[in-house]
Amino acid sequence: MLIVGPPGAGKGTQASRITSGYGIPDISTGDIFRANIKNKTELGQQVKAIVDAGDYVPDSLTNELVTGRLAEDDAKGGFLLDGYPRTLEQVKYLDELLGSDGEKLDAVIQLVADREEIVARLTKRAREQGRADDSEEAIRYRQEVYVRETSPLIEVYRERGLLVEVDGLGPVDEVAGRICTALAERGILPLTGTGESVA
């Protein structure tokens, strides 16, 4: 499965709910990058040099790191990808990678949230936490980048019938319940097997 959603929609929180409820690992490209940098792997050193230069990590390197992570034992029974794929080239690569093992994606969970409500939420949080760098302008810019980058991917998965759109606003438990219900409608049940909310 994949999870996508705009910054501030609670993607990280819901990803951890999904992974604990369904017994699958949450595989975040950001976490993979940080772990490789921390462990000073060869790929991690390449990522660090690129990030330090202010550039985006190229698809080829990201693909290589994701391939390595998906080959680990805990991902054999399923996984939730967060932050990948980000480009159409990565979508193609992931298709080929999963296809080579006779696997395919079961669902792409999209947390849908009103942009103005997210901007208000993040602006308030930045103010409360004294994060001056998180101006409303910066928050709006990140929202625009998200829409620009992910719209083509979302359309690909919508056309394939994999997209599961869920209202991402509201209490954490309610959103988790919506996700669980939407997945159950596709025959994807949590470890409890009841199709009920995974709290």
UniProtKB/Swiss-Prot annotation:
Q: What reaction gets catalysed by this protein?
A: AMP + ATP = 2 ADP
| Record pathway | Purine metabolism; AMP biosynthesis via salvage pathway; AMP from ADP: step 1/1
Where in this protein does the record put region LID?
A: 124-134
InterPro entries named among the record's database cross-references:
Adenylat/UMP-CMP_kin, Adenylat_kinase_CS, P-loop_NTPase
Location of this chain's protein in the cell: Cytoplasm
Q: Which domain of life is it from?
A: Bacteria
Its annotated function is as follows: Catalyzes the reversible transfer of the terminal phosphate group between ATP and AMP. Plays an important role in cellular energy homeostasis and in adenine nucleotide metabolism.
Q: How does it assemble?
A: Monomer.
Name by which UniProt lists this protein: Adenylate kinase
Name of the encoding gene:
adk
